[in-house]
Amino acid sequence: MAKTKTEKKAKSAINEVVTRECTINLNRRLHKVGYKKRAPRAVKIVRKFAEKEMGTNDVRIDTRLNKALWHRGIRNPPFRIRVRLSRRRNDDEDSPNKLYTLVTYVPVSTFKELQTENVESTED
């Protein structure tokens, strides 16, 4: 016999506003990509990573992150990059998405022993 459903479904965690710091290894994702496509592909990789990690289709990349990806030119984006992913509420009423993800650059001196961590969000 089938079980009766007595449990109430939990709210989806994707609807919560949250901020995380992550390291993205661009080197393994840019392997075998032509020189003139590396920096543009790095931007697309960051966008795809944020979309998967935070579960939102609307991803906005900060200008400082864009400059960090492009600062060595089109051929040589950094091997790794530390980013802060902030899932935020969309103020635009006619937008199809209720939430969006803002991706900002976090400068670090070394990537050793860094892990993904939740950050107490401070609204700007």
Swiss-Prot record:
SUPFAM superfamilies: Ribosomal protein L31e (SSF54575)
GO CC annotations on file: cytosolic large ribosomal subunit
CDD domains reported for this sequence: Ribosomal_L31e
Pfam short name (any one): Ribosomal_L31e
PROSITE patterns in the cross-refs: RIBOSOMAL_L31E (PS01144)
One GO-annotated biological process of the protein: cytoplasmic translation
Annotated GO MF terms: structural constituent of ribosome
InterPro entries per the UniProt record, alphabetical: Ribosomal_eL31, Ribosomal_eL31_CS, Ribosomal_eL31_dom_sf
Keywords linked to the UniProt accession: Ribonucleoprotein, Ribosomal protein
Family, as annotated: Belongs to the eukaryotic ribosomal protein eL31 family.
Name under which the protein is recorded: Large ribosomal subunit protein eL31
Organism: Aedes aegypti
